[in-house]
Amino acid sequence: MALRPAAGAALGLLLGLLALPAAAAPACPPVKPQVRVSISDPEPRLSTAFGIDALHAKSGRPRSANVHHLALTSSRVEWEGEIDARTATGRGGVCARPERVMLTLTQTEHLIRIAREIPRGSCLFREVEAHERRHVAVNRRTLRAAAARAREAATAWAATAEGRGVTEREAVAALQRGLRHAIERTVGAMRAQRDAAHRGIDTEAEYRRLSRVCSADQRALREKLRAVSAD
């Protein structure tokens, strides 16, 4: 019998603990998000530092005795995002919302490589460069299209985005992850669009056309390559 009051007291304590209210999640601050997108697209560089063999290796395409890789245009797009956030703190932690979102899309590498075996200023050099400039146009056009889509994606994301965490740093980091997820999908779509446009340029018909232009330069190039392979 002496144990019953103790058991009752313990039960009462347990019930009291269970009745404590949970820490409420903090209300998120009101914001009117602003999104700014900028582009960095410097003029592509033109290089003749690589020979035909090196361009073959960089292209990743199989070698062929009848097909020579005369040029290669490369481009890499990177993006950076900054968020100015407003935060609210409560017993349940911190809620962060984006007040300003700044995005920058940059063409960090844009390089036209033309085989050094082709003399600068020659008919063949001009034809090959004109072909590569079409690839440059694709890269620049798709970068601008990606910037427009990134603005739309960031605006839609910012309208409802919330980041929560125990600390302000955790809450802002959650916002950054959400922005990265939204923009990476846009950049991925740009890469797919860009690849398709490049394939539309590098057609069999275009390669046949290039093989017939500047006949004197083509003969001189073939003789040069035969002389090199004979050594």
Predicted stretch roles:
Residues 8-21:
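Bacterial N-terminal signal peptides
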Residues 105-106, 111-119, 144:
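Sequence context surrounding c-type heme c attachment/ligation sites in exported
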Residues 133-150:
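Catalytic Zn2+-binding segment of zinc metalloproteases
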Residues 121-134:
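Short alpha-helix carrying the canonical HExxH Zn2+-binding catalytic motif
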Residues 29, 33-104, 114-115, 157-231:
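Metalloprotease/metallohydrolase-associated module, dominated by Zn2+-dependent proteases
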Residues 1-4:
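N-terminal secretory signal peptides that target proteins for export/translocation
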